[in-house]
């Protein structure tokens, strides 16, 4: 089902009468969307090496000859297959009748959940320095998080996104006369977008590849993506990225009312910085086909 909760509040008032004022606000969103889904897993016969349901011959890659009775000895399974088939907590057996030529399509029913959390708030202060000078300062902070879709199987991996943002601004208005007003402003903003795979079950960790017989280091939790032909692939490429945008703005504007003419003088300088990390299309953990 779908559920969304939005909540928050505002509060403000004077700190010093006719001189100093403040305002704060907060808004939060929690969104959940869940329901049933199906996927395909290897049946018990396949886990025992019995591939007699396949219409074509099974060829032994070591000699190019058909496998007798389409029965592969379990002793010839690689470490990844043995670890996968020997751990039903990570890779469960079918729990319903499948369909398709081999009867495995949709043979496992599970649930999914899409999760979104969002928090944002502001703090603002106004200060009247003098009849001719007014200062304003504001700080804003936000955190938008999507947790993707909760995986149907522990060995499936989905991705999540963290999007923290923050900004600050200081503004000074100076009235020189009834016809001349100056506005000066300095601001800063930062937007970060972080994409990462999620180990929903917590059973994989950073040593899953080693436990599944896959060599190489593993800097993030998860399992390398293993593509298969008849049932759903497992694991994840582990595609990760981290992008941080920083923006600095310096602004000044002088407004002068000269008889019938309105004259504006000033400038706007912006410094933009982007720092980006991307693991590549093959991800951190890679893929096996």
Label the predicted regions.
Residues 1-289:
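Short acidic-glycine motifs
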